[in-house]
UniProtKB/Swiss-Prot annotation:
GO terms for molecular function: asparaginyl-tRNA synthase (glutamine-hydrolyzing) activity; ATP binding; glutaminyl-tRNA synthase (glutamine-hydrolyzing) activity. Keywords: ATP-binding, Ligase, Nucleotide-binding, Protein biosynthesis. SMART domains: GatB_Yqey. PANTHER family: GLUTAMYL-TRNA GLN AMIDOTRANSFERASE SUBUNIT B MITOCHONDRIAL AND PROKARYOTIC PET112-RELATED, GLUTAMYL-TRNA(GLN) AMIDOTRANSFERASE SUBUNIT B, MITOCHONDRIAL. This is Aspartyl/glutamyl-tRNA(Asn/Gln) amidotransferase subunit B. Signal peptide: none annotated. It comes from Geotalea uraniireducens (strain Rf4) (Geobacter uraniireducens). It comes from the Bacteria. Its EC number is 6.3.5.-.
Amino acid sequence: MKYQVVIGLEVHVQLLTNSKIFCGCSTRFGAEPNSQTCPVCLGMPGALPVLNKKVVEYAIRAGLATNCRIAPRSVFARKNYFYPDLPKGYQISQFELPICIDGHLDIEVEGGMKRIGITRIHMEEDAGKLVHADVPGVGDDSCVDLNRACTPLLEIVSEPDMRSADEAVAYLKKLHQIVVYLGISDGNMEEGSFRCDANVSVMPAGSDKFGTRTETKNVNSFKFVKQAIEYEIERQIEVIEEGGKIVQETRLFDPNTGSTRSMRGKEEAHDYRYFPDPDLVPLVIGNDWVEDARLSLPELPDAKRQRYTDELGLPVYDAEVLTATRELAGYFEACLALSPQPKPVANWVMGEVTRALNEENRSIADCPVTPPLLADLLRLIEKGTISGKIAKTVFDEMWRSGKAPEKIVEEKGLVQVSDTGAIEAIIDEVLAKEAGQVEEYRSGKDKLFGFFVGQVMRASKGKANPALVNEILLKKLNG
């Protein structure tokens, strides 16, 4: 029997605010356990939450960037459950009236586009963290770190529109790129700033009735999401074909085995006994607030890619690479403003700049070759002062020393030879030395032309103007 896979994702995005959602405690990652807490974080009696305005602004920006409608009125609700890392005994979230609804993202699937619906985006606080590893002085006991409690989150809930693990990863990558572009999250998956719950079910192909779903919690890498979904698909199909039934449950992914395991029975909404939080008034968002947020949005990746292909004439591949991060796109555009040659600038940014960054594991913000320096280098190539090959040598020296390209060219005597007389002399010397190869070329072995070009460039120590070398060499060989 053939099966249809149904996938929906719930993505938790930790927001890049300095303070928590309902108190003034720091959100800094990596602090000493329980050093960033207060009576609100700890759920002490009488401590009242105060909503962080920045969290609301970030939620609105996320909603606009994902084509959602911003609700004019939304309400915080208490999600009641017991867990050691939840000191209040409930989590402040949103239920019936979230801040953003009815959005979508378009993803590329097998050369075409597919629209993935977004049911809702809501604000909520994170729970604390249980540490199960051995702790000095504690032994094998589990410890609770409440630094993360009350940290602001957005939960972005998709429609069950994905039909493969690849589609789920494509959606997740696009969402990740958007929240990082917006500057509302650092997207650090290792630190838990961007994590995903994957809801997976299977049903007979052609059926319109969804199967029983399982939820795999807190998967924190694109690779693991793909593995978890693919494993869960295979597991569910195997259970069904052996005559069993899928249990609606919450599962955990084990990256060491690439498998999922049962964690607990899957709760329904009524199990959490949601009700409006009496300590927080309904949130009313006016049109002015929404429009201000809309005007503050940066150019998003899709629009930027389209502009690069339509207005700059760049290939689709180049546009995708250059818009991978907002910082890389900014570097490219800063170079382009100083040296308006889209394709050459793109080639250098995607080539030498990216290579050097990767070799030293640097970010583009830490690039020692600034846009003005790279633009100066490209101008030297354009004017014919140096060749493209020599330019790579100059770039490496710029990277190491931070010197201007003109100074490096002058100090090392790298100016390109464009004097026809000097180039002719070098060519004559090479042809005289390779008389046998010349005869073979003239007998029809045209491929030897590249050999002669290489010999001339070697004899000139790479300084000869390649265009002139080709032109003069062709005349002499065919003359």
